[in-house]
């Protein structure tokens, strides 16, 4: 497929937007899904100040902006801002006309139906796309890993979900979703850093904490053991330089923040950790397929990038599951973008071409057609 006619794949994450052309092996544009609005009035005339900034530009000017993520927990809470992000994707990042390319969007499972309908409506009515499809993120991650059977643990910035898939069929009754993901871990890290006397309050300072989290955090294989080690020696302490040059030391916070994935009670969330959620999801599946699911636990999304997370998940599942069960956790190196890569594979398949919702079908049936044609 050439760029003239190739479908466009946009993976709208709560934290990052990944966009590019179907058939490519990586997204061309990756930028934070955020909108920044000035906190102060501009006084220098003729500087061409805008009333809002998108993505990297908002990130670089964050010192004077208040930042807002339009997607929270995988659900769009501000459609005007969402439109700005899509506009930015088409016209500034990919530099293509939206009416010339079919578009594939992604979504978290168990999302409100209205979210899909509105997405469909904006794409057809505002951007005039010729064809449209929306796909479940975890399913795409499985495509990207080259499997048709497996259970995908996809954890991004806004949503963590577990989707079991057998021979290409998803099992909707066993899908589990947790609204506990990267952004909650960032908030938690903000809180435990405050105990050390480092206060991060503004939306811009939260971005600094997110960077600390991405660079320094890891998952402990044995949490209690690691806490003892941390108390005895300073071997796990790392220093981090803040943008103003001040250096702060980060100790047991490095593994305390991601621990919330396995112990959501740390955040006051009454729910099992990702290991229990995965286990429960497998238990809801038919007894004949469980063995295949245990042997293909595929991780995807940015929140699965912590060092040590695959080993810890493996250990926890071994403790939960029957003793004879062979458990394999697969953490592909490109898992940060595997949803996008799966979308790129799907949209370039010849068999997929009859699956698109065309403009004509949309005009006949309205936004509700998305529930019939996309599952």
Swiss-Prot record:
Highest taxon listed in the record's lineage: Eukaryota
Compartments where found: Cytoplasm, Cytoskeleton
Phylogenetic placement of the source organism: Eukaryota, Fungi, Dikarya, Ascomycota, Pezizomycotina
A cellular component term, taken from the record's GO annotations: cytoskeleton
Main subcellular location of this protein, as a coarse class: cytoplasm
Gene that produces this protein: act1
Enzyme class, UniProt record, top EC level: hydrolase
Enzyme Commission (EC) number: 3.6.4.-
Protein name: Actin
GO molecular function, one term: ATP binding
Catalysed conversion reaction: ATP + H2O = ADP + phosphate + H(+)
InterPro entries given in the database record: Actin, Actin/actin-like_CS, Actin_CS, ATPase_NBD
């Amino acid at each position: 497929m050439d760029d003239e006619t190739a479908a466009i794949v946009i993976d709208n994450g709560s934290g990052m937007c990944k966009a590019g052309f179907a058939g490519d092996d990586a997204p061309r544009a990756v930028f934070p899904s955020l909108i920044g609005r000035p906190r102060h009035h501009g006084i220098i005339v003729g500087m061409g100040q805008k009333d809002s900034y998108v993505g990297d530009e908002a990130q670089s000017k964050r010192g004077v902006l208040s930042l807002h993520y339009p997607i929270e927990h995988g659900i769009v809470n501000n459609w005007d801002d969402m439109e700005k992000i899509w506009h930015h994707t088409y016209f500034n990042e990919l530099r293509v006309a939206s009416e010339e390319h079919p578009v594939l969007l992604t979504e978290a499972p168990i999302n409100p139906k209205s979210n899909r309908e509105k997405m469909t409506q904006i794409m057809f009515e505002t951007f005039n796309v010729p064809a449209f499809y929306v796909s479940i993120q975890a399913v795409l991650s499985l495509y990207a890993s080259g499997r048709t059977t497996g259970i995908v643990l996809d954890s991004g910035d806004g949503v963590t979900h577990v989707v079991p898939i057998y021979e290409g069929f998803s099992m909707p009754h066993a899908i589990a979703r947790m609204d506990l993901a990267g952004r909650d871990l960032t908030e938690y890290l903000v809180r435990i850093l405050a105990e050390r006397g480092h206060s991060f309050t503004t939306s811009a300072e939260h971005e600094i904490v997110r960077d600390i989290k991405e660079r320094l955090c890891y998952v402990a294989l044995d949490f209690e053991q690691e806490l003892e080690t941390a108390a005895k020696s300073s071997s796990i302490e790392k220093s981090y330089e803040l943008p103003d040059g001040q250096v702060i030391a980060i100790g047991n916070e490095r593994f305390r923040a991601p621990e919330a994935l396995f112990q959501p009670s740390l955040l006051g969330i009454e729910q099992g950790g990702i290991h229990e959620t995965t286990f429960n999801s497998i238990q809801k599946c038919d007894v004949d397929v469980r063995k295949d699911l245990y042997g293909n636990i595929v991780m995807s999304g940015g929140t699965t990038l912590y060092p040590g997370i695959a080993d810890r998940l493996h250990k926890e599942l071994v403790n939960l599951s029957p003793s004879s069960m062979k458990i394999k956790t697969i953490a592909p190196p490109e898992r940060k973008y595997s949803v996008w890569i799966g979308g790129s594979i799907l949209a370039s398949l010849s068999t997929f071409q009859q699956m698109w919702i065309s403009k004509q079908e949309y005009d006949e049936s309205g936004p509700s057609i998305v529930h019939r044609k996309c599952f």
